[in-house]
Amino acid sequence: MSESSNGINKNQLQNAYQRSVSNIYDLYLTGPIEDAKQYQDWNQMMRTSTENDIIYIHINSNGGEIFTAIQLMRSMNETQATVVASVEGMCMSAATLIFLCADICEISEHSHFMFHTYSSGNWGKGSEQLASVQADDKWARHLFNQAYKGFLEPSEIKMIIDGKDFWMNPGEVEKRLEARNKKAKGPKGTKKPLQKVKKAS
């Protein structure tokens, strides 16, 4: 090779090949969260990422399909990569569940947050509707008590399940995340027990 400096000109290399040791992925969760099949590539990518990879989820969403969010939460918890949730506008409803699963939370100034319970409809015989409502209530209590634990007070989670909406600005969300981190004691063996909170530039 004619290159004599410490820098290597890849255009002059012969019989040399490049292998990436890490990747940075940018995923844009913008607008409504749609059907789960729209996010199959995201889930697969997260599950096959390595500990050297970084995944940015750029959030500007008013929520949507909660079961799609639940599957993404599973993939976020399973991935070996570092997941950064960057809120860049709206983070509401089901989008807040995804946000709170990240390893690092970035919040842009003037972003807007809203936390509330799920919406659904029931049909069928009266007994079937009653059974469905009771099952949904039990499911929602378990989900929100886990997802919002440490971020919302137990009394606030109960109010959400009962129908109250909680609106927050970036400063309020940052304070709650920092308080949750101080209280958190990740179980032994937990890969990433604590979140980092960053104000996006």
Pin down the residues of each PLM region.
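Charged, glycine-interspersed solvent-exposed loop segments at helix/strand-loop junctions
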Residues: 27, 55, 122-200
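STAS-typified acidic loop motif
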Residues: 2-41, 61
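Conserved strand-to-helix beginnings and helix N-cap segments that scaffold or border functional pockets
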Residues: 39-40, 66-70, 96
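Terminal peptide-recognition signature
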Residues: 29, 57, 99, 113, ...
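Catalytic phosphate/metal-binding cores of nucleic-acid and nucleotide-processing enzymes, i.e., regions
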Residues: 6-20, 48, 58, 70, ...
